[in-house]
A protein has these predicted regions:
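Short, polar loop motifs at secondary-structure junctions
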Residues: 1-6
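Long, well-ordered, tryptophan-enriched scaffold segments
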Residues: 8-9, 13-262, 268
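Acidic catalytic cores of enzymes that act on phosphate-bearing nucleotides/polynucleotides
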Residues: 254-288
Length: 288
């Protein structure tokens, strides 16, 4: 909180970003956590949790988009769904609400428990399969979903540029901008191709995992072809601790320390780290 409140005076560490810049704080913390707990040394707890209970392994369609300057780039679109495949992966009940991922063997998996399994007519084939379990819903066999196509035995892939929007350079009356020279960031992302025939997608379609897209958006350097040198936490590049310092006023060293401690505690306690928002965004929109 930017206010030295009753809560702040009792805290071990008080971080006071400029009002309204907490998103930049969160992005920089995410950058540190991804780099140190997923790449420098993978947390086994985070790895298992991310594969089983998050959307990080799920596949996303990459679409071609023409920028105002005429360049054609790939951008993240929607999730790949069972309805995009010929035969709908055998799903008669809401296949357009069932997401897919890669198993560690490189084959497409239909994870048990996505939203498409949660309602439908009584007596349907997938009735009762709404639990999030590490199983393929078709045969019930155990699966281990891939976070990245580069891991668990890298499968055939390409490294290509994917475009992400950048809003940190917008000048406003009340906030410091951090101009990076462009409002579109091109990041290197490993992609694969699937033969699809669904709504808005047909033929050989480029896809990527949410994890690979998220890591790229956060600016975490993985040493991919064409990625360039890693400037570290002191580089003024989007979402690094140094980048947020220019926007929030919070020293980069404090961001690094808090991110490490927050993630380390979550790792050791299996998830017992919490962000308590208080009477803010969750005070409105029917959250009272």
């Amino acid at each position: 909180t930017p206010d030295y409140s009753e809560v702040a005076k009792l805290a071990d560490l008080w971080m006071h970003p400029k009002q309204g810049t907490d998103a930049a704080v969160a992005m920089a913390m995410g950058h540190v956590i991804l780099k140190e707990f997923y790449f420098n040394k993978r947390s086994s707890y985070f790895d298992d949790y991310a594969r089983r209970y998050t959307d990080l392994p799920l596949l996303v369609v990459l679409e071609d988009k023409t920028l105002p300057d005429g360049r054609v780039v790939k951008v993240p679109g929607r999730y790949v769904r069972a309805s995009d495949f010929v035969g709908q992966l055998g799903q008669a009940n809401h296949p357009d609400w069932k997401t897919v991922a890669y198993n560690v063997d490189g084959q497409v998996a239909l994870p048990n428990g996505s939203i498409g399994f949660r309602w439908g007519q009584d007596g349907r084939d997938d009735q009762g399969l709404w639990n999030l379990e590490n199983k393929d819903a078709r045969q019930g066999n155990t699966v281990k979903l891939k976070l990245s196509v580069l891991e668990d035995g890298a499968q055939a892939h390409e490294i290509t540029d994917v475009a992400f929007p950048y809003f940190g350079g917008i000048d406003t009356p009340n906030f410091n901008a951090n101009d990076q020279g462009n409002d579109v960031m091109l990041r290197r992302v490993p992609i694969t191709y699937l033969d699809l025939n669904g709504e808005g997608v047909a033929g050989r379609v480029a896809v990527a995992t949410v994890f690979d897209l998220q890591v790229a958006n956060y600016g975490v350097n993985r040493g991919l072809e064409g990625e360039g040198a890693d400037g570290g936490y002191d580089a003024n590049a989007p979402y690094t601790p140094a980048w947020q310092e220019r926007i929030t006023g919070v020293p980069r060293e404090q961001i690094i320390t808090i991110a490490r401690q927050f993630a380390d505690n979550a790792d050791k306690t299996h998830g017992k780290s919490m962000v308590i928002i208080g009477a803010a965004m969750n005070h409105w929109y029917h959250c009272d």
